[in-house]
Amino acid sequence: MSANVTLLLIFVTLASVTAQTFQYSRGWTNGKRDQGHLRPELKELINNMDKILSPCQKNKLKYLLEGKPVTERLLIPCDILDTEEYPRALTERNLNAMMDAFY
């Protein structure tokens, strides 16, 4: 019985040490990976994301990355959403009818 407990403790200890070694190896700390292997143009693109995307586009991207469902509002171009008044053709009733036609 004590031999089984000893083997179990050794196994748990080795598993814990192995898991911690993997977590802190190859620049992977605190959930972030080292971006040293990225090409310079990709690094520049990542750093300039605020300049590339409009606030509307960032909100849509965040909404999708959070795993929320795709709605009609996501399909409307941002330049239309940024205006204060929607065009008469894009009322909620007309959008629903248009979406029903495609499904």
Curated annotation (Swiss-Prot):
Signal sequence range: 1-19
Keyword rRNA processing on entry: no
BP-aspect Gene Ontology terms: neuropeptide signaling pathway; positive regulation of heart contraction
Residues modified as Pyrrolidone carboxylic acid: 20
Tissue occurrence: Expressed in corpora cardiaca (CC), corpora allata (CA), antennal lobe (AL) and gnathal ganglion (GNG) (at protein level). Expression in CC and CA detected in all animals, expression in AL and in GNG in some animals.
Subcellular localization: Secreted
Major localization listed first in the record, in broad terms: secreted
InterPro entries linked to this entry: Procorazonin
Family indicated by similarity: Belongs to the corazonin family.
Biological role stated in the UniProt entry: Cardioactive peptide. Corazonin is probably involved in the physiological regulation of the heart beat.
Protein name, entry field: Pro-corazonin
Species whose genome carries this gene: Agrotis ipsilon
